[in-house]
Structure formats: structure tokens, C-alpha cells
From Swiss-Prot:
Residues 28-290 form the Protein kinase domain. Coiled coil: none annotated. This is Calcium-dependent protein kinase 31. It comes from Arabidopsis thaliana. It is found in: Membrane. Induction: Early induced by salicylic acid (SA) treatment.
């Protein structure tokens, strides 16, 4: 997936923004890292002249592999300028360029990720209510409505792309990432694959879509808010995509037992597989369930919040375990994978581009479609810079190739089992997860409950192995590599 081309582009001295270079360090004091994306890193910064705090997204030019990538950066800046002044969209300040990078300075959102708002609404052991779920989804849909009105299609709508303006309880929800966004005319059709797995619309998978795809993604976010997980989480990813295109959307199971019928009606309207029949953003905001006073203030089942945390943290646990496995592979074990990497990396740059991956897989006898290769690229490109380096390649290819080996899974298990007693306790899991900045006490407890099938309060090796081999967002497209 993703939004960028990967054709090689030789670095030139010409500017991307077509204006003089500026030393960003002379204008701002760059501080702590706030996050990383496909092109680069976002950091907190302070303007030297005013003392005001902003966020600075730094895009390394070496990560821009094609003219299309350069145009994508310029388009992101144009879109942010174009949308400036919208209440639920981060405010653009200025863009700078130096010899190595492009820097986009924007409003700093100090309240953290949108998920924190959900946690803040759930206090004293109670879950949030449908009315409070409306408070969360309304600004998201409002962003979609305003963007569509302004001729912009978002293409990668997901909770991670929204932050809170401050830590105040009445903080504003702000859309922060427009790297995948494009300008769009009414009725215009796009064909380029873009988006994120759980939230992607069926017509995007079919390669013919318009702005209605954003409504589907917003509908998935609402679905998660109401029942704690996306409607489609099947692995491998290819199977999940098949279900997105055709499987029944469940709003009748036990998870939905106490959800208002109006909420279910809205979800079904937003997740209509026919884009022409799908409800518009303006219609979503005018829906009876969304209007002030219509949604129930009765707390949603508390298990929903637990599921949300689990959904967020479980894959992170597996990623930590996968890193351990990859780091412990011997030179002999990865020799063949290194050779394969070298064969695919035809320009010997040390990274594999999308074009090289397509060509290499064809030579290996794969008949994957363009969309499937793009999905594979997205799955393997862990740091999101548009190419696959040797470590990412080994992690990706060894996933199918190594998880069947108990010794590799056991190495990961031992990383968590600090006292080597054959069990991972809550304390050991908490220690390891916090070491990697993942999870809190509640979600860690939930993970143990999920994985601990014999209910002894600990995770033994068999339970850990089952978890690692069960469906997760880490497995899918990596299994498409024709490696036996």
C-alpha cells in the first residue's frame, strides 16, 4: 500500500520547492521526536524569534525516489495551505528546504493521539457512551466533509492520522497527515492503490475509486468505536481484502447487542459497498444518530474499550517478538536471503524499490498482480521510507520462512521470560513492553487473558507460539514471496 512511487531518481542539486535553501536550525530549535512516517520524521520545535512551539516534519530527499515522490511532497504542502483555517485540520505555518531535506512546519498538537480521548472518556471503571462516540467521530467526518467540499480526497483516513490539539478535556481533534491526499474533481476516478489495510474501501482494492472511499474509512473507524475492532481482521491480508470486497458486515452479533439501531443504520450506510449509494459526509453529520441529543448516553459495554486497547497493542507485542527473532538469525541462516536480496537489488543501492521488487518476483516465478506487489512492499517496508533495506527484507521473508521453526520462536519467548522459568508473567511482559514503549497495565493484562488459554495467569511457550502463528497484521503479504 502507501502513496508513493519507487522509481529511482538520481539526486540533483535543483530544489524541490524551487526557492532558496534555508538552514532550519537557524530559525527553529529542533526538539524531541514526535513520530515517523513514510518519508521522514516529525519533531517538536520552537521558533527562535517568538518562542512558540510547533511541529516540524522533516522529509529526507534521499527518501524521494522519483519525480512522483517530489510532486507528492509539493502536493502535500499545497493541500495543507489550501485547507488552512479549517478547525479540525492542523494549521500549516511554512515549508523550508535545505540541501538534504524538506521541512514542513505546522501547528503542534500537544494532546497526543486520538485514542487518548477515548481513554479520557472512560473513567471510574466505566466505558464511554454512544453520545461520546459521536464526539469522536463527528470531527473526523467533518474533516472529510470539508476536504471533499474543498476538492481534496484524503485516501488514508485512520485514527493514527488524528491528534488532540492539547491535553484539555475539550481539546480539538485535528487531522495531521495529508501525504496520501490528492486534489479531486467531482466524479473523478482514481486508480492508484493507496490507504491502510483495515480501513481501505472495496473499490480501492478494485482499482477504481473516488472520494466516497473516505466515507468507507470513516465508517470503519465508527465501527471500531462501537464494537472495539474492525469488521475484517482475517489473515492473511489477501483473505481480509477478499472479505472487504464481499463478506457480510456484522452488526448483529453479541458485540452489537446493546448498540442503538440508529447507529447500526448509519454504519451500514457508510459501509455500503456501492460507492454511488454510500452516504455522503454531509449526510452522515445530519443523520439522526449524529444529531445532538439523539445518541444514547448509556455507556457502551466496557469490553469494547478493552478490545480497542488490545487491537492496538497485540500487533506491537508481535513486532517486538519478530525483531528478536530477526536479530538472532545467524549469518548462515540468512546467507540465502542476503543472496536473494542482492539478486533483486539490481542497481546495488542497498535497498529494493517497488520496480525492483516487481521485476525480481517475476524472475522468481511469481505472478502477483501490481496491487499485490504494492501490498507486499507496504508490508515489508517497516520504516515506511518507500524502499526495503536488508533488515526489513530478512524480517519479511523470514516471517513465513522462520515462524514454523520452534527454536526461533523460543528465542523470542526467552526474551520475555527473564527468569527462564518457562513462563512469561505479567511483570515480565510489562517490563519488555515498556522497554519498547508499548502497552499499559490494563492492555497488558488483556493480552495475557487473550493468550493465556489455560488460565494460569502466565503465558507458557505453547501459548506464545500459538499467538505468534495466529493471524496478525504482520503475516499477510510477506507470505506471497515465493520462498520455500
Amino acid at each position: 500500500m502507501g502513496c508513493y512511487s519507487s522509481k529511482n531518481l538520481k539526486q540533483s542539486k535543483r530544489t524541490i520547492l524551487e526557492k532558496p535553501f534555508v538552514d532550519i536550525g537557524k530559525v527553529y530549535i529542533l526538539g524531541d521526536e514526535l513520530g515517523q512516517g513514510q518519508f521522514g520524521i516529525t519533531r517538536k520545535c520552537v521558533e527562535k524569534t517568538s518562542g512558540k512551539t510547533y511541529a516540524c516534519k522533516t522529509i529526507l530527499k534521499t527518501n524521494l525516489k522519483s519525480r512522483e515522490d517530489e510532486e507528492a511532497v509539493k502536493r502535500e504542502i499545497r493541500i495543507m495551505k489550501h485547507l488552512s483555517g479549517e478547525p479540525n485540520i492542523v494549521e500549516f505555518k511554512k515549508a523550508y528546504e535545505d540541501r538534504d531535506s524538506v521541512h514542513i512546519v505546522m501547528e503542534y498538537c500537544g494532546g497526543g493521539e486520538l485514542f487518548k480521548k477515548i481513554e479520557a472518556l472512560s473513567k471510574d471503571g466505566k466505558s464511554y457512551s454512544e453520545k461520546e462516540a459521536v464526539e469522536i467521530i463527528r470531527p473526523i467526518v467533518n474533516v472529510v466533509k470539508n476536504c471533499h467540499y474543498m476538492g481534496v480526497m484524503l485516501r488514508d483516513l485512520k485514527p493514527e492520522n488524528f491528534l488532540l490539539s492539547s491535553t484539555d478535556k475539550n481539546a480539538t481533534v485535528k487531522a495531521i497527515d495529508f501525504g496520501c491526499s490528492v486534489f479531486i474533481e467531482e466524479g473523478e476516478v482514481h486508480r492508484k492503490f493507496a490507504g491502510s489495510a483495515y480501513y481501505i474501501a472495496p473499490e480501492v482494492l478494485q482499482g477504481k475509486y473516488g472520494k466516497e472511499a473516505d466515507i468507507w474509512s470513516a465508517g470503519i473507524i465508527l465501527y471500531i468505536l462501537l464494537c472495539g475492532k474492525p469488521p475484517f481482521v482475517t489473515e492473511p491480508e489477501a483473505q481480509m481484502f477478499s472479505e472487504i470486497k464481499s463478506a457480510k458486515i456484522d452488526v448483529d452479533s453479541e458485540s452489537w447487542k446493546f448498540i442503538d439501531v440508529k447507529a447500526k443504520h448509519l454504519v451500514n450506510r457508510m459501509l455500503n459497498r456501492n460507492p454511488k449509494e454510500r452516504i455522503s459526509a454531509a449526510e452522515v453529520l445530519g443523520h439522526p444518530w449524529m444529531k445532538d441529543g439523539e445518541a444514547s448516553d448509556k455507556p457502551i459495554d466496557g469490553v469494547v474499550l478493552s478490545r480497542l486497547k488490545q487491537f492496538r497493542d497485540m500487533n506491537k507485542l508481535k513486532k517486538v517478538a519478530l525483531k528478536v527473532i530477526a536479530a538472532n538469525l545467524s549469518e548462515e541462516e540468512i546467507k540465502g536471503l542476503k543472496t536473494l536480496f542482492t539478486n533483486i537489488d539490481t542497481d546495488k543501492s542497498g535497498t529494493i524499490t517497488l520496480e525492483e521488487l516487481k521485476t525480481g518476483l517475476t524472475r522468481l516465478g511469481s505472478n502477483l498482480s501490481k496491487t499485490e506487489v504494492e501490498q507486499l512492499m507496504e508490508a515489508a517496508d517497516v520504516d515506511g521510507n518507500g524502499t526495503i533495506d536488508i533488515d526489513e527484507f530478512i524480517s519479511a521473508t523470514m516471517h513465513r520462512y522462520r515462524l514454523d521453526r520452534d527454536d526461533h520462536v523460543y528465542q523470542a519467548f526467552q526474551h520475555f521470560d527473564k527468569d527462564n522459568d518457562g513462563h512469561i508473567t505479567k511483570e515480565e511482559l510489562e517490563m519488555a513492553m515498556k522497554e519498547h514503549g508499548v502497552g499499559d497495565e490494563v492492555s497488558i493484562k488483556q493480552i495475557i487473558t487473550e493468550v493465556d488459554t489455560d488460565n494460569d495467569g502466565k503465558i507458557n511457550f505453547e501459548e506464545f507460539r500459538t499467538m505468534m502463528r495466529s493471524g496478525s497484521s504482520l503475516q499477510p503479504q510477506r507470505e506471497l514471496l515465493p520462498i520455500k
